[in-house]
């Protein structure tokens, strides 16, 4: 099969890389970095950006359709100066996301963490009324 959706490592790329990725892949799955000056064509420094994630799929200024990862990830331990994030916190984020009509709820789960934690998240998100679908169905 030919890949149709791209995910940048750690949801991070330069402005130029986002444009290049868009030439090969019409769809990305991720949170994304938006760089200062992207909409105005003005120059900005390499660290003049902010992370952006949406409650639903969007077309971004780099010319790509972006499927959001907007609930974060399960992380039982403090890492990279980020506090632990437990299964219930991912579910709570999905519940808060329901303030939006037709919201998409998407999260990341590392495969080396215990499967029962993933099952808690899935059950909790389903209990909030979400339906799980493949990423290609969101296009």
Regions found by a protein language model. Give the residues of each.
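Amphipathic alpha-helical segments that form well-ordered structural scaffolds
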Residues: 1, 20, 120-124
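A structural motif corresponding to the C-terminal end of an alpha-helix
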Residues: 1-2, 100
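Generic intrinsically disordered, low-complexity segments enriched for polar/acidic and small residues
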Residues: 3, 53, 127-129
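Short catalytic-loop micro-motif centered on adjacent basic/acidic residues
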Residues: 4-8, 106-109
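Active-site-adjacent pocket scaffolds in enzyme catalytic domains
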Residues: 7-98
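C-terminal domain-boundary segment and adjacent tail
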Residues: 25-46, 97-139
